[in-house]
C-alpha cells in the first residue's frame, strides 16, 4: 500500500464501494492521486481483487490517459516490490497493456471495431483527419447547393431563406449557417430528432400564453434579475434624499418609482401571464423631477439622478427588447419564421445524410461519428421512447466491474448516455466513479454540459451508505496560503448559482493543505501577497498631479511614432516585473521558490514563470516581442500565425503564380522576395512598361526589351514556365521540395536571423502538402484552395518553435492549455480585455435547450429585428458565457503555487475605479448577480472585490478626491499589493542581465562538484571572471536624442547606477483611430508644435489659419479642436512674443545634429585612452530669433505645470536648454544670449 497520508475525505473516495460516487475535487485537491490509489487498492484487495482490465478508466485527453497508465504502472511496480512473490499483482502489470485506460473517443473506436457488423460499417474503415474531413464537407455542401439551384421550382422556401439571411452577392452566409448548425447538433445523441423538436416549437398557436414557453420563462427570469438589481440602489437613493439638504421635493417621486418597481417585481414573481406583464411594463411612467432649491447638495443630486436614469434605462430596455409584443403578435412572427427554419433544418439533415454517404463510400468516419456510432451500438429506443441498453451493451456491463470517469464536469450528453448504457445502474448495482470540479468546467464551446455534474452534485447524498454518494475534496495541496486566501476572497464575493452556476461558500472554498517548509536563507524572500498591477493606457486633460510630484512634460510621453499599443504597454510592464523578480529588493533579498526535486529553496528561474492569457491571438506575438526585447527567453505555443510568417507567404505566393501567373499581388511578392530579388526600381520599370496590363503581361513585355531589368525578367519567366510544366506531373509536396532546392530559398532563409525557425516553418508547409495528398485529393489548385479555406475558417496553426517549453524559458499560454498544470509563479495578464460576446450577434443563435433564435426578417418590407426567441437565447447565452468566464478565471488563479501576479490595462483609472466603487458598495457579502452580469472583463470582478479589502486604500482612492466609499471593508486573511502605473512608468524598458543568472548557476555547480580538479576549477573561474575590455562601451548608442538624454539624467537623479535605456519597437496609432478615445497629451503637444511652426504670427486670424490647415489636410479635425487659440494669442501678446515679432529673422522647428564625446554623456564610464568614439546628439529647437549679433532661444511646453512652479521647471529642463544653446552656437556661430521656456498652460515665461 502507498505510504501517503490521506485525508479523511480522500480515504473515503479511495475505499467507498458499491455505489455511484461523485467526487467533487477542487483545484489542487489531489484527484489524480486519489484515482490511481483507488485503482491500485481494487486490484490488490485481499478479499475481492479485480483485474486491471476489468476497469474502464475514461480520461479527457490522450495525454491524461498516458499519464494515468504510467502512474498506475509505477504504483503496481512499487506494490510488487513490497509484495514479493505475489503472482496476482505481477499479473496486473502484464494486463495493464490491454487495460481500458483511454479517452471516451478511443473507447468508442474500440466498441465500433469490435461490433462493426451491428451498424453495417466497413470493418477496414479509417478515421478522416481534419484536412480530409474539411474538404469532404466542402465538397458535399457545394454539391447540395448546386442541386438546389438546378431544381429551383421545387425549392422556393430555400430562396426565401436566401433572401432573408443570405448575403447580397452569394450564398456563403447560408453555407456557413448550415455548417455551424450541423457542427452544433453533433453533441446531441440523435441530431435529427433534436432539429425536428426545436423547429416544431415555432409552430406556436395564437391564443396561447407566450410566458409558458421555455423562451418566455427565461425572459421572465432574466427580467426579474435585472429588476431586483435596482432594489438596493433605489432604496439607497431614497435614503440619500432624506439625509441631504434641499432635495425634499425629490422624495415623493422616488418613492413612487420605487413602489412601481416593487409591483413589477411582484408580478414577475407571481407568474402573471405574458400579456399582463406586457401591459404593465409599457404603462410604467416616470414623472418629471421637480426643481430643487439653490441650497440643494449638488453631489447628492447628481448621484440620485444617475440612479433614476439607470432605472429608466432598465425599464426602457425591457420595453424595447423583451416586452415589445403581445403573445398573439409573437405567435404571428413564429408562424412566419416556421417554414424558413424548417428549410434550414432540412438543409442540415440533407447535408448530414450526404456527408455520411460520402464517408461510407470511402470507408471512412470522422471524429464525431465515433460517439454516435458507439451510441447506436450500445443504445436503443423502445416503443415508449425510453432509451435502454442493447445486448452488446450488456456484454460491456458484464466486462467492467467499475467505470471511472476523470474530468466528469466536461462530459456531454452523448458521453453520458454511453456511460449509462454500460454501467450497472439499471440493474440496481451502480458502479460509476466520477471525479471532477464543476468550477473548472470551461469547455461549453465544445458543448460540454456542466449541468450533468451539477444535477448529481445537488441530488447525491453525503451519507456513506447511499447508493448515490458525493464526497467533497476541497483541501488544496498545491498553493501557498497567500494564494489560496486570495482566491477564496475573490470567489466568495463573485460566484453564485446565477452567475457561475455554483454558490462559492464556506463549503466550496479551498482549504490550504500544501506544506511549504520555512526558508532558512535570510537573503531570499518567498511567497508574498497577491499582486494586482493596473496600467492606465491614456491620460486625459484632467490629469491631477499628486502632491510633490513633478510636472509632466509632453516629451516625457512617447513621440507620435512611439505611442505604445495597449497590449504592448501591459507586456512591457510584465517584462519589467519579471526582471524585478531576479533582482534584489530594497532589503537586498532575491525571490526564491521551492524546488520539489531538490527538496530545497533556490532562486527563481525563467522556467518557473508562466504568463496566462485568456486569448493568445494578437497577445502572444506582442508579449513575446516585448520579453525578447528585454532579453527574457520566452516560449509561446500560439497555435496560430503559421500562414502569416514571411517565408511561408513567399512560398504560397510562388505556388499561386505557378498555378495562375495573372495574380498581381502574389507575383509582386515573389518578385520582391530573395527568390527573384527585384528592387523597387526594377518593379517600377516593369510597371511603366505597360501601366494598363497585369504585372505578368508587363513582365513579359519587359523581358523582350533591351533594358537593365530585361535579363532578370527573362530568366524568371523561363523558370516560371518550367515550374508550371513540372506542376502538371509532380505531386504538390514534390514540387515544393524541388522549389526549395532549385531556388535556394530554403538555404537563404536558414542564413537569416532566426533561420532555424524559418526553415522549420518551410518543412511544416512541405509536410502539410504531403499530408494533404495522402487524402483522396490532389493537385496544386486544390491544395491552394484548401490552404485558403484553412485561413478563412480559423484553421491556422502555430509557427515552428526552436525553443522548447522544457527549456529555461518563460512560458506563454492560454488559460485553457494551462488546465491541469501548476507553476511556481503565475502572471495572469490581459484582465482588462473585453469578454468575447460576438456569438450573440449572429443572425441565428443556437442553444442546447432553447433551440433556434433567429432574427425576424421580412425582406419584402425590408424589416429586420431580433425575434423574441433570439432575445431569450441571447440573455441565456450571456449568463452562461459569463458563468464560464468566471470559471476560466478560477482555473487561471488556481494554477499558481507560490506567487500570483494579476495585470490589466484600463483606459482611464479614475472612471474605471468609480465604476468598480459602485459595485463594491453593495452591502451584501456576495455581489448581486445583476452586478456580476454587467462585467465586461475580469477586472470588473476582481477590482470591486479587492476594493472592499482592508489593504485596498490605493484602489479606493483611485476613484478621485472627494469620492466617499460607503461599502463594507473586509478584514480578510488574504494579502494584496496594488500597483497603479501609467505610461511614464514603462517609458524606459528594462533589460535582463543575462550573465547574472548563468554565472550563479555555474558557480553553484562548481561548488557542488567540490572534488573537481583544482587546476580545472581555477581555469574555469579565470574564464568566468574575464571581461571584454570595451564591454561597457558596447552598450553605447551611436546616436541619442535630447529627450532621451533628459530622461536618462532625470532617472539617474532618482536612482543610482541607472543605465540609459531605449524604447523598443513601438506601434503608431492609425489616423482613423485618433478620434475614438481622444488625443493623448503627447499628441496634443505635437499638434500645437505643428501649428506654432506654420502660423503667420503677423496675421491675427489664428483660428482662420488653423481652418486652412485642416482644409489642406495638414491637420485633422480632432487635432484642430485640441488647439487652444487663446493660449497662442496670449503667447504672441506676451513680452517675449512681441520681441519675436519685432525680430527680422525668426526660425522655428530647427533640427540639429552635433557630436559629443562619450564621457560627456556617460561620465561613469572608465577613461580609455584608445577609445575615441563620439555620440551623435539629435534634437529640434522650437524657436529662436536674432537680435543684433546674438540669439534668443524659446522652448514651448504644452503640458500641465502648476502655476508659479518655475524653479522645478528650471531644474527639469536645464540640461535640455543647455544642449539646445550649444547646438545653436555651433550651427550659427553666434552667441545664445537669452534662453526662455514659455508655459502654455499658465502663460508664464521662465528665464533659464
Swiss-Prot record:
Gene3D superfamilies: 3.90.320.10, P-loop containing nucleotide triphosphate hydrolases
InterPro entries: AddA (IPR014152), DNA_helicase_UvrD-like_C (IPR014017), DNA_helicase_UvrD/REP (IPR000212), P-loop_NTPase (IPR027417), PDDEXK-like_dom_sf (IPR011604), PDDEXK_AddAB-type (IPR038726), Restrct_endonuc-II-like (IPR011335), UvrD-like_ATP-bd (IPR014016)
Co-factor(s): Mg(2+)
Gene Ontology molecular function, alphabetical: 3'-5' DNA helicase activity; 3'-5' exonuclease activity; ATP binding; ATP hydrolysis activity; double-stranded DNA binding
Residues covered by the UvrD-like helicase ATP-binding domain: 4-480
Keyword Metal-binding: no
Reactions catalysed, as given in the entry: Couples ATP hydrolysis with the unwinding of duplex DNA by translocating in the 3'-5' direction; ATP + H2O = ADP + phosphate + H(+)
Gene Ontology biological process terms in this record: double-strand break repair via homologous recombination
Domain UvrD-like helicase C-terminal: residue ranges: 523-820
Keywords: ATP-binding, DNA damage, DNA repair, DNA-binding, Exonuclease, Helicase, Hydrolase, Isomerase, Nuclease, Nucleotide-binding
Pfam families registered for this protein in UniProt: PDDEXK_1, UvrD-helicase, UvrD_C
NCBIfam families: addA_Gpos (TIGR02785)
Assembly behavior: Heterodimer of AddA and AddB/RexB.
Protein name as annotated: ATP-dependent helicase/nuclease subunit A
Amino acid at each position: 500500500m502507498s505510504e501517503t497520508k490521506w485525508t479523511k475525505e480522500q480515504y473515503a473516495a479511495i475505499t467507498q464501494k458499491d455505489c455511484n460516487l461523485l467526487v467533487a475535487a477542487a483545484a489542487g485537491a489531489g484527484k489524480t492521486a486519489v484515482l490511481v490509489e483507488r485503482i491500485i487498492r481494487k486490484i490488490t484487495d485481499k478479499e475481492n481483487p479485480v483485474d486491471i482490465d476489468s476497469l474502464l478508466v475514461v480520461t479527457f485527453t490522450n495525454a491524461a490517459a498516458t499519464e494515468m497508465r504510467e502512474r498506475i504502472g509505477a504504483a503496481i511496480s512499487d506494490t510488487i516490490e513490497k509484495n514479493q512473490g505475489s503472482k496476482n499483482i505481477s499479473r496486473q502489470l502484464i494486463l495493464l497493456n490491454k487495460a481500458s485506460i483511454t479517452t471516451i473517443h478511443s473507447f468508442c473506436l474500440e466498441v465500433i471495431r469490435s461490433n462493426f457488423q451491428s451498424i453495417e460499417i466497413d470493418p477496414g474503415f479509417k478515421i478522416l483527419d481534419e484536412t480530409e474531413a474539411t474538404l469532404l464537407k466542402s465538397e458535399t455542401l457545394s454539391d447540395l447547393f448546386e442541386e438546389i439551384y438546378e431544381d429551383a421550382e421545387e425549392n422556393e422556401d430555400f430562396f426565401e431563406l436566401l433572401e432573408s439571411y443570405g448575403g447580397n452577392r452569394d450564398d456563403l452566409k447560408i453555407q456557413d449557417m448550415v455548417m455551424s448548425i450541423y457542427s452544433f447538433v453533433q453533441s446531441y445523441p440523435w441530431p435529427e430528432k433534436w432539429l425536428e423538436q426545436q423547429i416544431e416549437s415555432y409552430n406556436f398557436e395564437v391564443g396561447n400564453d407566450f410566458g409558458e414557453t421555455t423562451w418566455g420563462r427565461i425572459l421572465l427570469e432574466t427580467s426579474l434579475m435585472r429588476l431586483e438589481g435596482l432594489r438596493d440602489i433605489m432604496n439607497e437613493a431614497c435614503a440619500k434624499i432624506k439625509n441631504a439638504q434641499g432635495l425634499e421635493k425629490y422624495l415623493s417621486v422616488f418613492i413612487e418609482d420605487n413602489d412601481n418597481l416593487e409591483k413589477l417585481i411582484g408580478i414577475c414573481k407571481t407568474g402573471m401571464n405574458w400579456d399582463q406583464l406586457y401591459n404593465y411594463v409599457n404603462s410604467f411612467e416616470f414623472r418629471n423631477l421637480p426643481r430643487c432649491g439653490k441650497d440643494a447638495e449638488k453631489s447628492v443630486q447628481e448621484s440620485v439622478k444617475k440612479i433614476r436614469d439607470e432605472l429608466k434605462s432598465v425599464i426602457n430596455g425591457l420595453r424595447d427588447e423583451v416586452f415589445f409584443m403581445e403573445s398573439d403578435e409573437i405567435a404571428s412572427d413564429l408562424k412566419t419564421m416556421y417554414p424558413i427554419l424548417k428549410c434550414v433544418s432540412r438543409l442540415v439533415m440533407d447535408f448530414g445524410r450526404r456527408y455520411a454517404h460520402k464517408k461510407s463510400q470511402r470507408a471512412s468516419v470522422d471524429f464525431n461519428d465515433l460517439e454516435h456510432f458507439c451510441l447506436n451500438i450500445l443504445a436503443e429506443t423502445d416503443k415508449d421512447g425510453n432509451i435502454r441498453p442493447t445486448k452488446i451493451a450488456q456484454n460491456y456491463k458484464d466486462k467492467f466491474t467499475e467505470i471511472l470517469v476523470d474530468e466528469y464536469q466536461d462530459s456531454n450528453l452523448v458521453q453520458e448516455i454511453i456511460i449509462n448504457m454500460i454501467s450497472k445502474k439499471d440493474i440496481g448495482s451502480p458502479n460509476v466513479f466520477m471525479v471532477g470540479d464543476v468550477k473548472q468546467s470551461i469547455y461549453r464551446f465544445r458543448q460540454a454540459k456542466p449541468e450533468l455534474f451539477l444535477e448529481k452534485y445537488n441530488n447525491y447524498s453525503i451519507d456513506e451508505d447511499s447508493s448515490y454518494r458525493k464526497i467533497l475534496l476541497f483541501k488544496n495541496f498545491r498553493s501557498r496560503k497567500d494564494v489560496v486566501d486570495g482566491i477564496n476572497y475573490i470567489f466568495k464575493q463573485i460566484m453564485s448559482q446565477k452567475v457561475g452556476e455554483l454558490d462559492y461558500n464556506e463549503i466550496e472554498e479551498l482549504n490550504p493543505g500544501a506544506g511549504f517548509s520555512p526558508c532558512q536563507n535570510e537573503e531570499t524572500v518567498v511567497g508574498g501577497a497577491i499582486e494586482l498591477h493596473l496600467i492606465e493606457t491614456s491620460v486625459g486633460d484632467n490629469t491631477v498631479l499628486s502632491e510633490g510630484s513633478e510636472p509632466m512634460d509632453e516629451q516625457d510621453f512617447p513621440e507620435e511614432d512611439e505611442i505604445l499599443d495597449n497590449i504592448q504597454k501591459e507586456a512591457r510592464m510584465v517584462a519589467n516585473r519579471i526582471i524585478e523578480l531576479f533582482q534584489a529588493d530594497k532589503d537586498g533579498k532575491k525571490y526564491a521558490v521551492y524546488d520539489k526535486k531538490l527538496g530545497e529553496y533556490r532562486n527563481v528561474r525563467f522556467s518557473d514563470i508562466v504568463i496566462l492569457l485568456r486569448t493568445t491571438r494578437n497577445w502572444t506575438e506582442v508579449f513575446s516581442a516585448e520579453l525578447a526585447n528585454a532579453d527574457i527567453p520566452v516560449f509561446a505555443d500560439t497555435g496560430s500565425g503559421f500562414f502569416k510568417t514571411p517565408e511561408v507567404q513567399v512560398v504560397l505566393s510562388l505556388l499561386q503564380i505557378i498555378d495562375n501567373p495573372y495574380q498581381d499581388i502574389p507575383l509582386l511578392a515573389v518578385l520582391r522576395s530573395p527568390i527573384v530579388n527585384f528592387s523597387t526600381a526594377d518593379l517600377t520599370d516593369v510597371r511603366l512598361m505597360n501601366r494598363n496590363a497585369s504585372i505578368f503581361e508587363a513582365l513579359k513585355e519587359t523581358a523582350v526589351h533591351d533594358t537593365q531589368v530585361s535579363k532578370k525578367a527573362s530568366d524568371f519567366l523561363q523558370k516560371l514556365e518550367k515550374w508550371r510544366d513540372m506542376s502538371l506531373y509532380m505531386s504538390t509536396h514534390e514540387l515544393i521540395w524541388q522549389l526549395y532546392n532549385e531556388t535556394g530559398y530554403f538555404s537563404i532563409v536558414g542564413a537569416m536571423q532566426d533561420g532555424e525557425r524559418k526553415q522549420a516553418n518551410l518543412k511544416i508547409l512541405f509536410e502539410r502538402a504531403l499530408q494533404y495528398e495522402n487524402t483522396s485529393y490532389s493537385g496544386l489548385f486544390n491544395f491552394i484552395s484548401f490552404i485558403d479555406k484553412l485561413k478563412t475558417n480559423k484553421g491556422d496553426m502555430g509557427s515552428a518553435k526552436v525553443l522548447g517549453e522544457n527549456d529555461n524559458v518563460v512560458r506563454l499560454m492560454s488559460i485553457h492549455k494551462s488546465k491541469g498544470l501548476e507553476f511556481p509563479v503565475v502572471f495572469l495578464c490581459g484582465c482588462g480585455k473585453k469578454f468575447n460576446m460576438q456569438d450573440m450577434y449572429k443572425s441565428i443563435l443556437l442553444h442546447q435547450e432553447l433551440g433556434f433564435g433567429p432574427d425576424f426578417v421580412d425582406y419584402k418590407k425590408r424589416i429586420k429585428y431580433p425575434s423574441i426567441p433570439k432575445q431569450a437565447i441571447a440573455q441565456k447565452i450571456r449568463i452562461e458565457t459569463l458563468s464560464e468566464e468566471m470559471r476560466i478565471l478560477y482555473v487561471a488563479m488556481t494554477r499558481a503555487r507560490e506567487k500570483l501576479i494579476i495585470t490589466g490595462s484600463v483606459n482611464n483609472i479614475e472612471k474605471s475605479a468609480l465604476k468598480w466603487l459602485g459595485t463594491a458598495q453593495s452591502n451584501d457579502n456576495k455581489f448581486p448577480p445583476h452586478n456580476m452580469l454587467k462585467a465586461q472583463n475580469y477586472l470588473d470582478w476582481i477590482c470591486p472585490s479587492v476594493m472592499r479589502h482592508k489593504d485596498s486604500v490605493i484602489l479606493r482612492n483611485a476613484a478621485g478626491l472627494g469620492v466617499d466609499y460607503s461599502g463594507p471593508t473586509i478584514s480578510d486573511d488574504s494579502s494584496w499589493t496594488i500597483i497603479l502605473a501609467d505610461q511614464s512608468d514603462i517609458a524606459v524598458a528594462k533589460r535582463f542581465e543575462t550573465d547574472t543568472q548563468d554565472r550563479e548557476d555555474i558557480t553553484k555547480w562548481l561548488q557542488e562538484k567540490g572534488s573537481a580538479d583544482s587546476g580545472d576549477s581555477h581555469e574555469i573561474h579565470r574564464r568566468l571572471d574575464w571581461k571584454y575590455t570595451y564591454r561597457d562601451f558596447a552598450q553605447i548608442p551611436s546616436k541619442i536624442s535630447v529627450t532621451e538624454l533628459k530622461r536618462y539624467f532625470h532617472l539617474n537623479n532618482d536612482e543610482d547606477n541607472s543605465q540609459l535605456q531605449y524604447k523598443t519597437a513601438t506601434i503608431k496609432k492609425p489616423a482613423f483611430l485618433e478620434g475614438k478615445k481622444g488625443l493623448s497629451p503627447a499628441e496634443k503637444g505635437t499638434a500645437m508644435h505643428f501649428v506654432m511652426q506654420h502660423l503667420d504670427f503677423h496675421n491675427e486670424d489664428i483660428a482662420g489659419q488653423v481652418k486652412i490647415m485642416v482644409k489642406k489636410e495638414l491637420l485633422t479635425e480632432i487635432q484642430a479642436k485640441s488647439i487652444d487659440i487663446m493660449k497662442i494669442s496670449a503667447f504672441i501678446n506676451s513680452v517675449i512674443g512681441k520681441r519675436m515679432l519685432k525680430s527680422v529673422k525668426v526660425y522655428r522647428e530647427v533640427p540639429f545634429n552635433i557630436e559629443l564625446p562619450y564621457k560627456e554623456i556617460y561620465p561613469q564610464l572608465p577613461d580609455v585612452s584608445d577609445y575615441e568614439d563620439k555620440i551623435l546628439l539629435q534634437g529640434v529647437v522650437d524657436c529662436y530669433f536674432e537680435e543684433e549679433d546674438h540669439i534668443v532661444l524659446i522652448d514651448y511646453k504644452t503640458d500641465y505645470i502648476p502655476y508659479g512652479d518655475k524653479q522645478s521647471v528650471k531644474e527639469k529642463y536645464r540640461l535640455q536648454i543647455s544642449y539646445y544653446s550649444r547646438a545653436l552656437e555651433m550651427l550659427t556661430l553666434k552667441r545664445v544670449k537669452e534662453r526662455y521656456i514659455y508655459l502654455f498652460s499658465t502663460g508664464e515665461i521662465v528665464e533659464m
